[in-house]
Design a protein with these regions (language model features):
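Alpha-helical transmembrane segments and their helix-start/interface "positive-inside/aromatic belt" motifs
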Residues: 1-12
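Generic alpha-helical transmembrane segments of integral inner-membrane proteins
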Residues: 11-19, 57, 61, 65, ...
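Active-site and channel-lining beta-strand-loop segments
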Residues: 22-51, 144-153
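Ordered, amphipathic secondary-structure segments that act as subunit-interaction surfaces
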Residues: 65-114
Length: 166
């Protein structure tokens, strides 16, 4: 899939996510849960929900900027599928996590359950497993992968580092 098409698809996902949050925003209480440690143990103003809803789009923009300012940006084309997979997984995961506060407020999450911790840790774990599988395909760049000074200066070292890191 071309990166421009993917960017616009993810932009639509982020906008729809934010619009859905805006739809439910008036029905939220003034204080919403923002942190879980087995059960809700952190609270914040309901505007936090909108900040969390905007975060996936902000990260999507940041990923595009990073791709353009990296001194070895031409290498992104060589491992574009891995980078695109990371951007898709990360953006979708952030959009999904942005719903945890609303789900807790509307009673869709058990209050004294470790479900949130399991979902967040499980999602991040799956992301790392998938990335670990694809890390050997990453070419030299200053943004993505295991970036030690030695690996950045030597192509062979870079390949070995990514393979071991994965």
């Amino acid at each position: 899939m071309k990166k421009n098409k993917l960017f616009w698809i993810l932009t639509v996902v982020c906008v729809l996510n934010f619009a859905a949050h805006l739809y439910f925003y008036p029905s939220l209480p003034d204080i919403v849960p923002t942190h879980w440690g087995g059960q809700v143990n952190g609270w914040g103003p309901k505007s936090t929900v909108l900040i969390l809803a905007a975060l996936p789009f902000a990260m999507l923009i940041l990923f595009e900027v990073i791709r353009k300012i990296d001194p070895k940006h031409q290498n992104f084309e060589k491992f574009g599928k891995v980078w695109n997979l990371f951007v898709v997984l990360f953006t979708v995961m952030m959009a999904a996590f942005s719903w945890l506060s609303e789900l807790a407020v509307f009673g869709k999450l058990p209050d004294s359950s470790n479900l949130v911790s399991i979902l967040v840790c499980g999602g991040i774990g799956v992301l790392f497993i998938i990335l670990g599988n694809f890390m050997p395909q990453i070419k030299q760049n200053y943004t993505f992968g295991c970036r030690t000074p030695w690996a950045l200066n030597d192509e062979h070292n870079w390949q070995r580092t990514q393979r071991m890191g994965g």
